[in-house]
Amino acid sequence: IYANAEKYPIIYAKYAEEGNFPKIEDSFYNYRKNISFNNASLMYYPPYSQYIRNYLYNETYALGHSPMRNQYSSKFTVDLLNTIQSKIDIESSKNAFLRQTVISHFYNKSSCDINEEAFSTFLKLSTNEKDKKLIQNLVDDSKAIRINNNLPNFNVTNYNNSKHSISKIIKDRNAFLFFWSPEFVSESYIVSRINFLSNNYPNIQFIPVKIDGDKNNRIQKLDIKNQFYLDNDSDAYKFLTSKMPRSILINKKGKVINGFASISSYNLNNYLKQLNETK
C-alpha cells in the first residue's frame, strides 16, 4: 500500500491530461513517520525494497523535476543518485540502489549517447569496486562504437562451428545485432522479444550473438541460421568488456545508427522504425 502511495503522484501525472503532478497535502505522507528507511533485514524483501525505490523517486521529483514519461534526464538521474546517497545509510543497500539506477536509466535511454555526469556521479558515490569496474567498462563499451561510422569487423561462430565475418553476414541488410549473456537475460525473454520485433519490423535481420556462458547451447526456439556466438579471441570483445547485453543497429550501407540500444526499452522503437524503412 505504501509503495503505491509513493508512486501515486507519478502515476497520476502519467495519465493526467495536463501531465502535471497532483497537489498533495503534507499529511498524505504521515505514514513515513512509522517507516524505517534503513532496515537491513528487510532490504532484500521485494515489497520493502520496492517501497524504498518509489520513495527515492518521489523525493527526487519533489526537488522540482517535471514528470518524465519515456526517459529520465541526466539532471534527474544525478539528483536521484544523490538522494540515494543522502537517504540510505546501509552501505551494501546504497551501492545496490546506485548500481541499479545508473544501469536502468542508461538502458532505458537506449542510446550510445551517454549521460557523462550521471556516470561520474555514480563512480564518485559508490564504494563497491566491482560495481565501479562494471560501470566503467559499460561507459568504455558505449564509446567504442559510434553512430554514422562503419561497424568494426569481427568474427562470429555459427552452431556448425564455422567462423564468419560479421560484415559478410549483414552485407546489404538492415541488421539488429543482439549481444547477450545468460547471466543477464533469459532465453525465453529473447525468444519472445525477437519474435515480436521480427513480426513488426520485417525488413530487419535480427541476429542474437551469445557472448558468455555455454557456447554449445543455442536458443532452441529461434532459427539456428541467425544465431551465433563469440569465440574467446573475437575482436568483438573490445566493445563488450562489461559482458552486459547490447544491441547494435546497422543499416544496409554498414553504418551504425545506434551503437548501444536496449532490446527491452520503449525508446528502441523509433530506431527500429527508422531502420525498417531504410531502402
Predicted stretch roles:
Residues 1-159:
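Oxidative protein folding and maturation machinery
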Residues 107-110, 182-186, 213, 263-264:
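Short acidic, S/G/P-rich loop/turn micro-motifs used as interaction or catalytic elements
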Residues 159, 178, 201, 244-245, ...:
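Exposed, low-structure sequence patches enriched in small/polar residues
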Residues 164-194:
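Short active-site neighborhood of thiol/selenol oxidoreductases, capturing the structured segment around
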Residues 171-174, 202-205, 224-225, 252:
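Loop/turn elements at helix/coil->beta-strand transitions in domains of secreted/extracellular proteins
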Residues 183-223, 232-235:
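Structural microenvironment flanking redox-active thiols in thiol-disulfide oxidoreductases
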Residues 219-253:
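Short, internal strand/loop/helix patches
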Residues 252-279:
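Thiol-/selenol-based redox modules, centered on thioredoxin-like
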